[in-house]
């Protein structure tokens, strides 16, 4: 099972993230590739995603509802680490509810760092 993301750099009133400058990301599609004959099936996990809705109209029949995924596969669907990393980075700033605290960035969070080799610190990676 592969995660497929819908992204945009033009989502209104959203803060860009990383070098790609994306400001909209969703894990809207799960891709299953049959190991025996290579057929690919795309399952929609976020039917409300406007990009997925557009793809469905442009390529009718390509995307199937998540309910059609076999239960044996559906039980293996996990929350993607990449989305979690993006959300954690955004939440570090946007968890603040008081406008004054937010404006002054008085309660800015950071992802914990782990000491690495040769005095280098690396951000802690998410795990299941």
Q: Where are the regions a protein language model picked out?
A:
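Exposed beta-strand-loop-beta-strand "reactive/processing" segments of non-cytosolic proteins
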Residues: 1-32, 104-128
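Accessory, solvent-exposed terminal regions and/or long lumenal/extracellular loops of proteins
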Residues: 51-128
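Soluble extramembrane regions of membrane proteins in the secretory/endomembrane system
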Residues: 10, 20-77
């Amino acid at each position: 099972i592969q995660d497929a993301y819908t992204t945009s750099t033009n989502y209104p009133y959203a803060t860009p993230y990383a070098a790609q400058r994306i400001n909209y990301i969703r894990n809207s599609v799960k891709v299953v590739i049959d190991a025996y004959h290579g057929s690919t099936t795309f399952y929609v996990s976020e039917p409300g995603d406007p990009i997925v809705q557009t793809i469905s109209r442009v390529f009718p029949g390509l995307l199937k509802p998540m309910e059609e995924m076999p239960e044996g596969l559906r039980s293996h669907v996990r929350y993607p680490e990449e989305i979690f990393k993006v959300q954690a980075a955004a939440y570090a700033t946007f968890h603040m509810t008081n406008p004054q605290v937010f404006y002054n960035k008085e309660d800015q969070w950071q992802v914990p760092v782990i000491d690495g080799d040769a005095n280098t610190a690396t951000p802690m990676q998410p795990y299941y």
